[in-house]
Amino acid sequence: MAPLVGVVALQGGFAEHIEVLESLGANTRRVRRSADLQGLDGIVLPGGESTVIDKLMRSFSLAEPLKDAVRRGLPVLATCAGLVVLATDLEDAAKGQHTLSLLDVTVRRNAFGSQLDSFEGTLDIDGVGDGVSATFIRAPVITRVGPGVEVIAQLPDEAGNVSGAIVGVRQRNVLALSFHPEETDDDRVHRTWLRQVSEEV
């Protein structure tokens, strides 16, 4: 039976995630209100503007029910702004910005600069594969990880060693990435995550 995956559809790149998920055989639901969380096997928090997503989640009374669902074990794939929304700490939070505080990391927003500084590359991601295509658009970076957080992806440093910025982590049922896997033709991130979701169903 195909898993039912919710995609938070308040703002940002949710349509691209839906397209990839459906191409891999998943059923999808756009999530805007707490009732949309019922019966989900997994949920995606897409990229976009983290401050806007935060305000809309609170305006639509989605933040607390979503927080509760994730704490109960609902599998999560968070990309770019979705990572920011989950973090316990932000180095450069906007005035009045809240997070769900579900992922024990510190994040610096827009760490790679403006939209003009966006770039594409490949990453080796533990549990996903080597040479995975990744698109970074005004991407955040993870500057601290808590003791229960596994680092699964880092950018290469100037010498080509994989010891640069942390751009992917896993903590229990949460997979969080700085980049946009949905903006590439490489579906391995979604495919791997869906396999894990299906195993939980």
From Swiss-Prot:
Catalytic activity: aldehydo-D-ribose 5-phosphate + D-glyceraldehyde 3-phosphate + L-glutamine = pyridoxal 5'-phosphate + L-glutamate + phosphate + 3 H2O + H(+); L-glutamine + H2O = L-glutamate + NH4(+)
Active-site residues, record numbering mapped to chain: C80 (nucleophile), H180 (charge relay system), E182 (charge relay system)
Molecular functions (GO terms): glutaminase activity; pyridoxal 5'-phosphate synthase (glutamine hydrolysing) activity
Gene Ontology CC terms, in alphabetical order: cytosol; glutaminase complex
Binding site for L-glutamine: G48, E49, S50, R109, I137, R138
GO terms (BP aspect): glutamine catabolic process; pyridoxal phosphate biosynthetic process; pyridoxine metabolic process
Summary of the function given for this chain in its UniProt record: Catalyzes the hydrolysis of glutamine to glutamate and ammonia as part of the biosynthesis of pyridoxal 5'-phosphate. The resulting ammonia molecule is channeled to the active site of PdxS.
PANTHER family to which the protein is assigned, alphabetical: PYRIDOXAL 5'-PHOSPHATE SYNTHASE SUBUNIT SNO, PYRIDOXAL 5'-PHOSPHATE SYNTHASE SUBUNIT SNO1-RELATED
Quaternary context: In the presence of PdxS, forms a dodecamer of heterodimers. Only shows activity in the heterodimer.
This protein's name: Pyridoxal 5'-phosphate synthase subunit PdxT
Organism whose genome encodes this protein: Cutibacterium acnes (strain DSM 16379 / KPA171202)
